[in-house]
Amino acid sequence: MYPVRDRTAWILAQRQPRRAAPDPYVPHGVFLEQERLASGVIAASGVVLLTNRECPWHCVMCDLWQDTTRESVPEGAIARQVEQAVRTWSNAGPLPSQVKLYNSGSFFDPAAIPPADYAPVARQIAFARHVVVESHPLLVGERARGLRDLLSGSLEVALGLETAHPGVLDKLNKQFDLAQFARAAEVLAVERIALRVFLLVNPPFLDAGAGLEWVVKSAEFAFACGAGAVTLIPTRTGNGAMERLGASGEFVPPTLAQLEAAQRSVLALGRGRVFADTWALEPFSACAHCFAARRDRLETVNREQRDLPPVPCAVCGRA
């Protein structure tokens, strides 16, 4: 059973051995995607998954620590990673108008991203009209303002709310409450920094059947806090802790149908852009025959921001 106290120690105890230490001068991933911007334009978005020190918060569902370093990376390492990303994008064609700097934690954690790298990174992505970084709500403040002032384009900060269910949020070990999240969102609004919110579909500790209800309530809370976009992430296993919670009945993985329903229901709110996370969706699908078409449909809805008819399948019986 999941403990009431010392949750971080329990979470860490479930981990498998770390992979080989990553090179602090090489990004974990670099790719391009298409995203509908706040303006309504569908544009190229360059994504770089930065290599840096593990996040100091140990959320029960997180597996991103597997590709992080144990120590802070040297000054200049992040700038070199971004330089490699820009070179990769340039080799693929025109540079993207939006850049996402994701780092398996918080961009504003100085132990993860040295503040001395902000200026050289900003210079390297001066071509970007819009830049997205991610952060823990408790780290939103002066460093966010500093980065905003260095960028040529506008700044957006993605915050992982995960859920607006107070009891579940506490058990996730996020170590903030809804009031603290709302204050971070207010700081961003005052500083004219856009807000994106990450939400989980079927987080652990929810009553059976309450997943859709609470992802909609969580989206309503996020939009009320000023979010211009929410990303719906199906809760995954793979970090040890989630497997234990599944075995104890405290977590039931979402299905592809539940992700589709969440996207449809949150989009129907009409409050902002809604993106379904389609990374590594195969484990959530029960039918290999219609999986690719259903994933493509989710991605089309992401781009067009309008609901589409469900994908029929003669094999699994979907209408």
PLM regions: where:
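Auxiliary Fe-S-binding modules of radical SAM enzymes
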Residues: M1-P27, E33, L37-A38, F223, ...
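N-terminal pre-triad scaffold of radical SAM enzymes
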Residues: A20-T69, R87-L101
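Hydrophobic faces of well-ordered beta-strands that scaffold small-molecule active sites
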Residues: A44-G46, S97-L101, V131-V133, L155-L159, ...
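Core AdoMet radical
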Residues: W65-Q81, A85-I113, Q124-V140, S154-F181, ...
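Acidic (Asp/Glu)-rich catalytic clusters
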Residues: T88-P94, V121-A126, A144-S154, E186-R192, ...
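Active-site-proximal loop/turn and secondary-structure-junction residues that shape catalytic pockets
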Residues: G105-F107, P137-L139, T163-H165, V201-F205, ...
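Distinct, well-ordered alpha-helical segments
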Residues: A111-A119, V140-L150, A208-G209
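Conserved C-terminal portion of the radical SAM core fold
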Residues: A179-A241, L259-T278
